[in-house]
Amino acid sequence: MEYLSDKFSLKSPAIKGSDYYMDQVMDTLDNVQYYNKASPKCVQAFPMQSNDQHSSMDRSSPCDNQSSVTYCAPKSEESSLHAMENCCSLRVSPATSGPDKTDLDELGEKCDSNVSSSKKRRHRTTFTSAQLEELEKVFQKTHYPDVYVREQLAMRTELTEARVQVWFQNRRAKWRKRERYGQIQQAKSHFAATYDISMLPRTDSYSQISNNLWTGPSAGSSVVSSCMIPRGSPPCVTSPYPHSPRAAEHGYVGFPNHQQNQFGVNHVSLNNFFADSLLASSANSHAAFETKPEFERRSSSIAVLRMKAKEHTANISWAM
């Protein structure tokens, strides 16, 4: 009661004992809104303002007349309601109005642009032909220029020292990559050439040479070259057919022939040398010759008959 007496003090003590005093206190308690968690924030923000207005109105208004009391209570209610409307309008207005919404969108876009601009962007430098020429000249001299050289080069090319340093780093990386690639290609070509020669298909040249030697009419020659046989060797060693006239005709060492042509002897001896050197280096060819004795005898007999026929025709033509 002391709080109420201090808050709602009246001018005359006689009015305190009347019934009107208690009615006035109850009305003020009903109009005052206390703090409550369930009440909205806008109502909580303006309770003291309504109380102050109500108390000031009570103090200023005369309490002798009852009409003044009825006038005071609606005034406080209207002020509190007006404060609530102002609060709610402040809270609802940004969402409902169109221009305010566009302003908020613009602010959001600006914030996003500021965030994106804060990120570090990498700019690609485009060099001119003159700048590249200057840089390449220095790179041919040294791959690792010092700070002084980089600064001088930056002044000549109108670039920053950092750009020049980055260019040299990229150029060194490119040079190392090319060197590595060149070494790999060189190794590949070397091994490819080595293995390609070894993997070539081998033709059966020895069998063809042996067949041409034994079956051809003009291919009758010794198996062993005359250049590789000593002069003192017997006729059985120098020629496989010591009793045939072909040995004398081709000019073996054991059977010299004075009537032979010089050019024919040279031609036949060279052919015999190359053919016999190939045959002598192959063991398979010797095995082939040893396993076909009947074929050799037949070919030798045919060759002897042909040579006899040639000699007969030559003698007839000479006699005529």
Curated annotation (Swiss-Prot):
SUPFAM superfamilies reported in the protein's UniProt record: Homeodomain-like
GO biological process: camera-type eye morphogenesis; embryonic cranial skeleton morphogenesis; embryonic neurocranium morphogenesis; embryonic skeletal system morphogenesis; negative regulation of DNA-templated transcription; neural crest cell migration; positive regulation of DNA-templated transcription; positive regulation of epithelial to mesenchymal transition
Range of residues in the leader sequence: none
Subcellular location: Nucleus
A GO term from the CC aspect: nucleus
Alphabetical UniProt keywords: Activator, Developmental protein, DNA-binding, Homeobox, Nucleus, Repressor, Transcription, Transcription regulation
GO MF annotation terms: DNA-binding transcription activator activity, RNA polymerase II-specific; RNA polymerase II transcription regulatory region sequence-specific DNA binding
Listed InterPro entries: HD, Homeobox_CS, Homeodomain-like_sf, OAR_dom, Paired_Homeobox_TFs
Subunit structure: Binds DNA as a homodimer; required for transcriptional activation.
Domain commentary: The OAR motif may negatively regulate DNA-binding and therefore transcriptional activity. It is found in the C-terminal transactivation domain that stimulates transcription.
Name the record gives this protein: ALX homeobox protein 1
Origin species: Danio rerio (Zebrafish)
